[in-house]
Amino acid sequence: MDTRSGSQCSVTPEAILNNEKLVLPPRISRVNGWSLPLHYFQVVTWAVFVGLSSATFGIFIPFLPHAWKYIAYVVTGGIFSFHLVVHLIASCIDPADSNVRLMKNYSQPMPLFDRSKHAHVIQNQFCHLCKVTVNKKTKHCISCNKCVSGFDHHCKWINNCVGSRNYWFFFSTVASATAGMLCLIAILLYVLVQYLVNPGVLRTDPRYEDVKNMNTWLLFLPLFPVQVQTLIVVIIGMLVLLLDFLGLVHLGQLLIFHIYLKAKKMTTFEYLINNRKEESSKHQAVRKDPYVQMDKGVLQQGAGALGSSAQGVKAKSSLLIHKHLCHFCTSVNQDGDSTAREGDEDPCPSALGAKARNSRLICRRLCQFSTRVHPDGGSMAQEADDAPSISTLGLQQETTEPMKTDSAESED
């Protein structure tokens, strides 16, 4: 069932993807749960019902003492019979809208929905496929390809849509199945405990007088007695108990869920739509959250700062060497100039003047070399000073984290 949000449309009978397979709606609208094709969930349901009924009334209830045996037949038989009736009614009822049932010919094929002509299947309470006016809570089911009044959901276990016409029969089916599972578990546990404590209590039927072996048991009493060994009874009991427990868990959850829906005055369809809207709003809120964007910006800034910090360290080192060289050369030049002036007064000026000129020449070449190695040392050093350090990034992140926590608490 393809559900779509909207006030007038729930399901569009178009080709949809289900488990990566293209699923087309049936061309002929389905009348009820017995319309072909039958769903394999429906077949499994009836097979389990027949199997559990046979095991309950044919194997385990005959093990009970006479006083408990007749009570179990009445109580368990009443629950199973009630379940059978409501299950059949829920499957046989046509849950379609009243106008659909009056005006629709189920033998005629349904047209395919053309979205280029209409945005939704149902618009202004008119179905463009069924060609009838429907109620406000009517939805068009893709599995049945018809409008269902008071649409709740399409149940694969009864192979029919659940709407306002058959909802309470469906609810009674789930409730009676849960009650029957509980009765069967109680009977199985009693038989198991008595077999471990006092097996003779389970052999009260008069036909056991002819059975001498204590490991031989009679099944399907009193109509068709069949002698089997203890191992066979234990295997059947464990399988039935496991199947009963799994069914009870599934049916119990389903029953509690529908009790919750009735308390909230909602349908299954409305519950699913509301959940989808809440999830969509949460995703949009996360995308628009400024604190999430701030955290991403801080991380990006931190990654850039690490690179710029490394460049800044190199720039500062080269600039420091450049400054020391120039300072050294300046001091040497000054010493050289003074030495040269003293050399003019010295009786041997030629030797001292030559040394001064050589010193100045060496210093000039060193300064030129350092300038070529790092011509933009000043600008890179300034960039390194302006780049945020690791401690600064940590302070920014610690500052933003409490703000994000407060925002999350306010949203909750």
Swiss-Prot record:
Residues 389-400 have a biased composition (Polar residues). Endoplasmic reticulum-localized palmitoyltransferase that could catalyze the addition of palmitate onto various protein substrates and be involved in a variety of cellular processes. Has a palmitoyltransferase activity toward NCDN and regulates NCDN association with endosome membranes through this palmitoylation. May play a role in cell proliferation. Also has a palmitoyltransferase activity-independent function in DNA virus-triggered and CGAS-mediated innate immune response. Functions as an adapter that recruits IRF3 to STING1 to promote the activation of that key transcriptional regulator of type I interferon (IFN)-dependent immune response. The chain crosses the membrane at residues 43-63, 70-90, 177-197, 231-251. It is found in: Endoplasmic reticulum membrane. It catalyses: L-cysteinyl-[protein] + hexadecanoyl-CoA = S-hexadecanoyl-L-cysteinyl-[protein] + CoA. Residues 374-412 are annotated as: Disordered. The lineage of its organism: Eukaryota, Metazoa, Chordata, Craniata, Vertebrata. Its EC number is 2.3.1.225. This is Palmitoyltransferase ZDHHC11. Belongs to the DHHC palmitoyltransferase family. One of its GO terms (molecular function) is signaling adaptor activity. GO terms for cellular component: endoplasmic reticulum; endoplasmic reticulum membrane; endosome membrane; Golgi apparatus; Golgi membrane. Keywords: Acyltransferase, Endoplasmic reticulum, Lipoprotein, Membrane, Palmitate, Transferase, Transmembrane, Transmembrane helix. Disulfide bonds: none annotated. InterPro entries: Palmitoyltrfase_DHHC, PFA4/ZDH16/20/ERF2-like. The DHHC domain is required for palmitoyltransferase activity. Interacts with IRF3 and STING1; in presence of DNA viruses recruits IRF3 to STING1 promoting IRF3 phosphorylation and activation. One of its GO terms (biological process) is positive regulation of defense response to virus by host. Residues 125-175 form the DHHC domain. It comes from the Eukaryota. It is a multi-pass membrane protein. Expressed in testis. Residues 401-412 have a biased composition (Basic and acidic residues). The active site is at 155 (s-palmitoyl cysteine intermediate). Residues 1-42, 91-176, 252-412 are cytoplasmic. Residues 198-412 are annotated as: Mediates interaction with IRF3 and STING1. The gene is ZDHHC11. It holds the Pfam family DHHC.
